[in-house]
């Protein structure tokens, strides 16, 4: 059996990476995917780098036993903490990470602040500092740590008064400012895009899933393992919580 038929592994600290999986299924309809959410240990964003690195490697080892042909780390925090080490250790498969989509936000050339919403760990890591340094000459970039937001989404709260209250509280310091764009620096956050848009009217909201999947496509092509069959691929969703509720939420968010 050809390696091309082997699944692509997509991992995250919980249900957030489903936003990347969704984009991947759209762009790569003939690929098979295995998604693994580590909700038992979520959120990663408030843990130490070493903890996140260890958790990430544990999940990857599980997926390698299922013969994945490529790995997508669909978690900004895990990418910040472990992507270089993963690429170093697993040289035989393409390993794709995700980072906040600052470049497209800067390229909009809109007046005002670019607000990066992300977990505390993503914003404090060297990888993000380097990314910021690349663009802060051109734009005013504001870091907005969002502790607690991942937990709300993991509980299935993606709309309604509780979410609105959380977001209004986060944005209150910027009500009078010109905002050029919001950048969603965590794969959980696209699921509350509608709620963000309802508060931050007419401000572009950008996430990195499209760019990540385009990079995945390029790598599959480069390794000559792109599946261009005619049969729609299969999707398997796994979660460390082993709880039907979290699996139901995952399928609901995938919304196929």
Curated annotation (Swiss-Prot):
Amino acids binding substrate: 12-13, 44-45, 76-77, 187-188
**Active site per UniProt:** 75, 186
Known SUPFAM superfamilies for this protein? Aspartate/glutamate racemase
Pathway assigned in UniProt:
Cell wall biogenesis; peptidoglycan biosynthesis
Q: Which reaction does it catalyse?
A: L-glutamate = D-glutamate
An example GO biological process term is:
regulation of cell shape
GO molecular function, one example? glutamate racemase activity
Q: Which domain of life is it from?
A: Bacteria
Query: HAMAP family, per this entry?
Result: Glu_racemase
Per the entry, what this protein does is: Provides the (R)-glutamate required for cell wall biosynthesis.
Q: Which family does it belong to?
A: Belongs to the aspartate/glutamate racemases family.
- Which PANTHER family does the protein's record reference? GLUTAMATE RACEMASE
What name does this protein carry? Glutamate racemase
- The organism named in the record is Clostridium acetobutylicum (strain ATCC 824 / DSM 792 / JCM 1419 / IAM 19013 / LMG 5710 / NBRC 13948 / NRRL B-527 / VKM B-1787 / 2291 / W)
Q: What is the lineage of its organism?
A: Bacteria, Bacillati, Bacillota, Clostridia, Eubacteriales
What gene is behind this protein? murI
């Amino acid at each position: 059996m050809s390696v091309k038929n082997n699944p692509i592994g997509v991992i995250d600290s919980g249900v957030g990476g489903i936003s990347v999986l969704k984009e991947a299924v759209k762009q790569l309809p003939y690929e098979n995917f295995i998604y693994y959410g580590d909700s038992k240990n979520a959120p990663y964003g408030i843990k130490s780098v070493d903890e996140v690195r260890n958790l990430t490697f544990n999940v990857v080892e599980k997926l390698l036993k299922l013969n994945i042909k490529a790995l997508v780390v669909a978690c900004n925090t895990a990418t910040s903490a472990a992507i270089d080490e993963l690429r170093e250790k697993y040289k035989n498969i393409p390993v794709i990470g995700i980072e906040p989509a600052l470049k497209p936000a800067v390229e909009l050339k809109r007046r005002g602040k670019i607000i990066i919403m992300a977990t505390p760990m993503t914003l404090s890591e060297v990888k993000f500092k380097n990314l910021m340094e690349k663009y802060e000459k051109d734009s005013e970039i504001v870091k907005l740590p969002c502790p607690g937001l991942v937990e709300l989404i993991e509980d299935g709260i993606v709309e309604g008064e509780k979410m609105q209250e959380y977001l209004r509280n986060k944005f209150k310091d910027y009500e009078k400012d010109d905002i050029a764009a919001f950048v969603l620096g965590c794969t959980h956050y696209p699921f509350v895009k509608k709620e963000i848009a309802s508060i931050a009217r007419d401000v572009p909201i950008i996430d990195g899933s499209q760019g990540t999947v385009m990079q995945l496509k390029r790598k599959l092509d480069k390794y000559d393992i792109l599946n261009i069959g005619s049969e729609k691929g299969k999707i398997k969703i796994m979660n460390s919580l082993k709880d039907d509720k979290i699996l139901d939420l995952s399928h609901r968010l995938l919304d196929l």
